[in-house]
Amino acid sequence: MKALKNIEVQLNQTPNKQISLTDPDARSMKTRGTGIVGYNVQTAVDTGYHLIVEHEVINEDVDRSQLSNMAKKARSAMGADDLIVIADRGYFKSEEILACHEAAITAIAPKTVTSIATADGRFGKADFILNAEKNEYRCPAGEALIWRFSTIEKGLKLHCYWSSACQSCAFKEQCTPSPQRRVKRWEHEGILDAMQTRLDLAPDSMRIRRQTVEHPFGTLKA
């Protein structure tokens, strides 16, 4: 019990509340159907030769903060001026897409669907059309959601829009249980929209990703 109490003190001092007594750097990782104490290996693979051009071993169990870091390292390793990086939805993070854009790297990663409204069968954000000229959204009922204010959430600056016509709208049950349907837009969301357009115009991108980044692992296992 005394030894466990000492470990508890150490545990409370660690950022992610984890201590591995066997390997100090290892962390608990989520895997399909189970978990493992180990590492998360990041690889960047070129589409031409299916060679790993850059890799990194991390002890974070999610990939969301790795896209721009790996993309920049891959570009440097390949000595390339231009780079298109394709990743799965596990790498989608607004700040990472922005970082790639600012580094002149073209990123393609599907958005993660986290909308409660969509999950409940109501109108999703995609059903609200932005009018950039007027800085307002048009809802499925044809009403205008005008800009109301800006706010900071999780470090991101968001613009908030809503309409005053929601209470009497015939589509309200299909839209929101709240008094108004509010739409929030990140200040750099135009970059995400442009990326989605790239993905729509290149529907085979995810197939290319699977054939590329998974290829070396298949070779190693074989």
Protein language model features and the residues they cover:
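Anion-binding and metal-coordination hotspots
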Residues: 1-222
